[in-house]
Curated annotation (Swiss-Prot):
Subcellular location, record wording: Cytoplasm
Database matches in InterPro entries: Chaperonin_Cpn60_CS, Cpn60/GroEL, Cpn60/GroEL/TCP-1, GroEL-like_apical_dom_sf, GROEL-like_equatorial_sf, TCP-1-like_intermed_sf
Key words of the record: ATP-binding, Chaperone, Cytoplasm, Isomerase, Nucleotide-binding
Protein name per UniProt: Chaperonin GroEL 1
Record flagged with keyword Repeat: no
Species for this entry: Salinibacter ruber (strain DSM 13855 / M31)
Binding-site residues for ATP, renumbered to this chain: 42-45, 63, 99-103, 427, 507
The protein's role, per its UniProt record: Together with its co-chaperonin GroES, plays an essential role in assisting protein folding. The GroEL-GroES system forms a nano-cage that allows encapsulation of the non-native substrate proteins and provides a physical environment optimized to promote and accelerate protein folding.
Record's compositionally biased regions (Gly residues): 545-570
Family statement: Belongs to the chaperonin (HSP60) family.
Pfam families, alphabetized: Cpn60_TCP1
Length: 570
C-alpha cells in the first residue's frame, strides 16, 4: 500500500515534512554552513581552488565564488533550502554588481550564525532583524560617502586587476577596452581559438547583415565591399521595382560617390540591375538587409539615420523612394561590408542629434524592466556612442579556458561597477572603517542592539577569511588593521601591511554595498523563519522491489514523487 494519503479525486497527495521554530532554523543553518564553507575558501588573492565535477566533459577548476555556489545542491531537503536561500544572496549580488558573491556569502553566514545564537537564547527575532537592517543601512550610507570616483586608465586597470585575481594582463586589457569604447560601449567576453588572450575593437556602428550578392565585393582577397565617402540610402520597405530606385541612383552617379542601400530587402529586377551597374563600373554600389526585426528594426534604422545625417525613407511618414533626393541620404567616411556584417565608420550626423538620441536610449534603459530589452538598448547605445570591444580569452586546455573566461567576466563586471559608483580600499578594510558609523544607529530596545552587534561582528568576517586563506591568523590581522587608520590594511597578495589605495588594492563601492545589503536581507529572513515545509526524504523501502507486476507501479510512483519534489526545490 502507498504511504501517501488519497485526495478526493482518487489520486495521491505527496506527504510533506514540517519543522517549526528552532528545529526549522537549525536545519536551514546546516545548509547555509555547508554552502558557505565551500564558497568562502575562494575569497581573496590567495583563495583556494574548488574542483567541480561535470556530468560530461572535463572537471572545472575555479576560484569563482558564484560558479561554486551554482553547483551546490545538498542531498537532504531541509538543509538544501538553507543553501539555496544563501545562494540567492550570492546570485543577487552578482546580478546587481557583477562580483562580490563570496563576500556576500561570508557576511551572510556570519549574520545568520550570530543571529541564530541570539534567537535561540531568547531574543525577539523581529527586533533582531530590525537592528540588523538599521545597522546595514547606516553602513551603506557610510560606504557611499567614502567612495572614491574611478577616473583614468590606470585606476580602471587597478580595479580590473584586483577582480581578475591580480592578473595584470587581464586588468590592462579591460582598461584598454574601456578606453577604446568608453563607458557606454559594449564589452563582451568570448573564447579565443588559440592560447592567446587579446582585445578586438569594432569602431563605428556594426550590425549583423552582409552584402546581398558577392558581386558587390571590391576587395577579392578579403571578400569585402569597401565604400569610401559613401552615401547611405535607408529604406524601411522592400525594393523590387527598379523604376522606384532609378531617380536616386542617377543623382548619386553624378557625384561619383559610392552608395550603400539599406532596405528590408532588395530583390528581383532591382538587385540584378544594381549588380550589372556595379560590374560595368557605372556605379559603385552595395546593398544589405536592414538589421533587427519588427519595432526594433525601425529603431535601428533611425539610429543609422541619426549617425549618418540621413532620413529613413518611409511611406508611413510621407517619404517615397521615387521622390528621394541627395538630402535624404546619410553619409559616412567609410563603409565595410563582408558576408556577415556591415560596419559604418565616421558617420556625418549632427553631434547634437546623436547626443539627443543617446540620451533618449539611456532613458529607455532606465525605464525598462526587461533584462532582454535593456541588453538590446545597451547594444544600440554602444553603437551610437562608443563601440564594441571583444575580449577573446585563450588557454591551453578546456578547464583552464572555462575558469579563465569566468574570471575575465567577473573582472569586467566589477570594473563596470567601479566606474558606476567608485571604489573603496579593498581587503575588507572598508567594512572595518565603517564600524564607527554603527555607533550612530538609534535602537529602541536591547534585542535591536543585538542586531546591531551582529552586523558589527559580520563586518570583520571578510578580512578574517582573507587572512585565513592566506595562511595568517584572522583575529590578529583584523586587530592590527583596526588599530590603523584610513586606507591602512593587509595586502593579502604581498602579505604586508600598508596603504591599500596606494598599492592598488581596491573594491568597487557597488560590490561592497550590494554584498552587505543582500547578506543582511537573507540573514534577517532566515532569523524570522518559524516553519519550513518540504517533501519527505526519499526512503529505500522494498515496496517497489518485489518481482512481478504488482511491485512496479508502487516503485514507479514513489520514484516519480521524489523527482517531483526535487523539481520544486530547484
Amino acid at each position: 500500500m502507498s504511504k501517501n494519503p488519497p485526495d478526493l479525486s482518487g489520486g495521491e497527495v505527496k506527504a510533506k515534512q514540517i519543522r517549526f521554530d528552532s528545529d526549522a532554523r537549525s536545519a536551514l543553518q546546516e545548509g547555509v554552513d555547508q554552502m558557505a564553507e565551500a564558497v568562502k575558501v575562494t575569497l581573496g588573492p590567495k583563495g583556494r581552488n574548488v574542483v567541480l565535477e561535470k556530468s560530461f566533459g572535463a572537471p572545472t577548476i575555479t576560484k569563482d565564488g558564484v560558479t561554486v555556489a551554482k553547483e551546490i545542491e545538498l542531498e537532504e531537503r531541509l538543509p538544501n533550502i538553507g543553501a539555496q536561500v544563501l545562494k540567492e544572496a550570492a546570485s543577487k549580488t552578482n546580478d546587481d554588481a557583477g562580483d562580490g558573491t563570496t563576500t556576500a556569502t561570508v557576511l551572510a553566514q556570519s549574520v545568520i550564525n550570530a543571529g541564530m545564537k541570539s534567537v535561540t537564547s531568547g531574543a525577539n527575532p523581529m527586533d533582531v532583524k530590525r537592528g540588523i537592517t538599521a545597522a546595514a543601512e547606516e553602513v551603506v550610507t557610510h560606504l557611499r560617502n567614502q567612495s572614491d570616483p574611478v577616473e583614468g586608465k590606470d585606476r580602471i586597470s587597478q580595479v580590473a586587476t584586483i577582480s581578475a585575481n591580480n592578473d595584470d594582463a587581464i586588468g590592462d586589457l579591460i582598461a584598454d577596452a574601456f578606453e577604446r569604447v568608453g563607458q557606454d560601449g559594449v564589452i563582451t567576453v568570448e573564447e579565443a581559438r588559440g592560447i592567446e588572450t587579446y582585445l578586438d575593437v569594432v569602431e563605428g556602428m556594426q550590425f549583423d547583415r552582409g552584402y546581398l550578392s558577392p558581386y558587390f565585393v571590391t576587395d577579392s582577397e578579403e571578400m569585402e565591399a569597401v565604400l569610401e565617402d559613401a552615401y547611405i540610402l535607408i529604406y524601411d520597405d522592400e525594393v523590387g521595382n527598379m523604376q522606384d530606385l532609378l531617380p536616386i541612383l542617377e543623382k548619386v552617379s553624378q557625384t561619383s560617390n559610392p552608395l550603400l542601400i539599406i532596405a528590408e530587402d532588395v530583390e528581383g529586377e532591382a538587385l540584378a540591375t544594381l549588380v550589372v551597374n556595379k560590374m560595368r563600373g557605372t556605379l559603385k554600389v552595395s546593398a544589405v538587409k536592414a538589421p533587427g526585426f519588427g519595432d526594433r528594426r525601425q529603431s535601428m534604422l533611425e539610429d543609422i539615420a541619426v549617425l549618418t545625417g540621413g532620413t529613413v525613407i518611409s511611406e508611413e511618414k510621407g517619404y517615397r523612394l521615387e521622390n528621394a533626393t541627395l538630402d535624404y541620404l546619410g553619409q559616412a567616411d567609410r563603409v565595410t561590408i563582408d558576408q556577415d556584417n556591415t560596419t559604418i565608420v565616421g558617420g556625418e550626423g549632427s553631434e547634437e542629434e546623436i547626443e539627443a538620441r543617446v540620451n533618449q536610449i539611456r532613458q529607455q534603459i532606465a525605464n525598462s524592466t526587461s533584462d532582454y530589452d535593456q541588453e538590446k538598448l545597451q547594444e544600440r547605445l554602444a553603437k551610437l556612442a562608443g563601440g564594441v570591444a571583444v575580449l577573446n580569452v585563450g588557454a591551453a586546455t578546456e578547464p583552464e579556458m572555462k575558469a579563465q573566461k569566468a574570471l575575465v567576466e567577473d573582472a569586467l563586471s566589477a570594473t563596470r561597477a567601479a566606474v558606476d559608483e567608485g571604489v573603496l580600499p579593498g581587503g575588507g578594510v572598508a567594512y572595518l572603517r565603517a564600524l564607527e558609523s554603527i555607533e550612530e544607529v538609534e535602537v529602541e530596545n536591547e534585542d535591536q542592539e543585538i542586531g546591531v552587534s551582529i552586523v558589527r561582528e559580520a563586518l570583520e568576517a571578510p578580512l578574517r577569511q582573507i587572512a585565513e586563506n592566506t595562511g595568517h591568523e584572522g583575529s590578529i590581522v583584523v586587530q592590527k588593521v583596526k588599530d590603523g587608520e584610513g586606507d591602512f590594511g593587509f595586502n593579502a597578495r604581498t602579505e604586508e601591511y600598508g596603504d591599500l589605495l596606494d598599492q592598488g588594492v581596491l573594491d568597487p563601492t557597488k560590490v561592497t554595498r550590494s554584498a552587505l545589503e543582500n547578506a543582511a536581507s537573507v540573514g534577517g529572513m532566515l532569523l524570522t523563519t518559524e516553519a519550513v515545509i518540504a517533501d519527505l526524504e526519499d526512503e529505500d523501502d522494498d515496496d517497489g522491489g518485489g518481482g512481478g507486476g504488482g511491485g512496479m507501479p508502487a516503485g514507479g510512483a514513489g520514484g516519480m514523487g521524489g523527482m517531483g519534489g526535487m523539481g520544486g526545490m530547484m
